[in-house]
Design a protein with these regions (language model features):
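Conserved beta-strand signature within the Rossmann-like core of class I S-adenosyl-L-methionine
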Residues: 179-187
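Conserved SAM/SAH-binding beta-strand->alpha-helix loop
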Residues: 120
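Conserved SAM-binding strand-loop segment of SAM-dependent methyltransferases
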Residues: 131-141
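A short SAM/SAH-binding and catalytic strip from SAM-dependent methyltransferases
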Residues: 149-166
Length: 293
């Protein structure tokens, strides 16, 4: 079903530091947040699917249950549901788990400063080809502009990264500027599920070691509905400013109470050096910011 998009007036931008987040040396990520294994997303079969532009690709649970992943949509342009989220973005935007970059490219086309991050080299390369800017890193790695981003996106199920919504919300709070906006896509039922899954393309044997040599290839993941996300968010000082459904996809916009203090582990601004120029520079290192042409 398709829901009606609520009035955007509830998303009046809060006063923010207007400096762009790319003017600060990234500091270490929060030491209390576990860093999940990112290897499965950086190699086959995810990379194969992105190169081909289509699936099949699934998250396979240990009991054999399959969650189809919409690779074709990810590799296409931003659709109406995506645009319903992008229209709400404020200030510079960080897209966590940007995949092949459709959202970053659309934001750039609309004049937003936007950066995608993804652990997949193939995803980052695809983002660059579409005209977006991307960095090959995990959300739990040190990132440029921590505490400066106007909006953080967790779309396409990325609220499930690491299998720990509470920890991911803590990390997101570190990345956002005071009063910044988190836009997350949830799942339609009231689900609060934490599982171990592996990537599966329907062709390779679902059991045994994966092709990376990283054990059995399973990693933690979460699937949560809007009520569950709000339950996780409330103790951390987040409050909902918008909820809507577009083309059957539910979204939530959250803002964190400015009075809730986030402990920053970023380098001292006064002693930091620029890691990205006013236009994201072209780099080729897997640890460096990357920009499209």
């Amino acid at each position: 079903m398709t829901g009606t998009v609520p009035n955007r007036s509830v998303l009046t931008p809060a006063p923010q530091d207007t400096r762009h987040p790319d003017t600060e040396q990234p500091g270490p990520a929060h030491p209390d947040i576990a860093h999940p294994d990112i290897t499965p997303w950086s190699t086959d079969p995810y990379a194969d699917a992105l190169r081909n532009g289509h699936g099949p690709l699934f998250l396979r649970r240990t009991d054999g249950w399959l969650l189809p992943l919409d690779v074709e949509r990810w590799c296409g342009g931003a659709d109406a549901a995506d645009l319903s989220a992008l229209r709400r973005c404020e200030g510079p935007v960080l897209d966590i788990g940007c995949g092949p970059g459709r959202l970053v490219a659309e934001l750039a086309a609309r004049g937003h400063r936007a950066l995608g991050i993804d652990v997949s080299e193939t995803a980052v390369a695809h983002t660059l080809r579409t005209g977006g800017s991307a960095l090959r890193r995990s959300v739990f790695d040190p990132l440029p502009g921590e505490g400066r981003w106007g909006t953080v996106l967790l779309i396409d199920g990325n609220i499930g990264i690491g299998g720990d919504p509470h920890g991911l919300l803590l990390r997101t709070a570190e990345l956002l500027a005071p009063g910044g906006l988190l836009i997350a896509e949830t799942v339609s039922p009231d689900i609060d599920e934490r599982v171990r899954v592996r990537l599966y393309d329907g062709r390779r044997a679902p059991g045994g070691p994966d092709r990376t040599g990283a054990g059995d290839g399973h990693f933690p993941w979460a699937r949560i509905g809007t009520p569950a996300l709000l339950r996780y968010a409330q103790p951390g000082g987040w409050h909902p400013v918008d909820q809507w459904v577009a083309d059957g996809r539910p979204f939530v916009a959250l803002r964190r109470d400015r009075r809730v203090r986030t402990v920053s582990h970023s380098a001292d601004t006064a002693n930091s050096t620029a890691v990205i120029s006013s236009q994201f520079p072209r780099k080729t290192s897997g640890d460096s910011p990357l920009a499209g042409s």
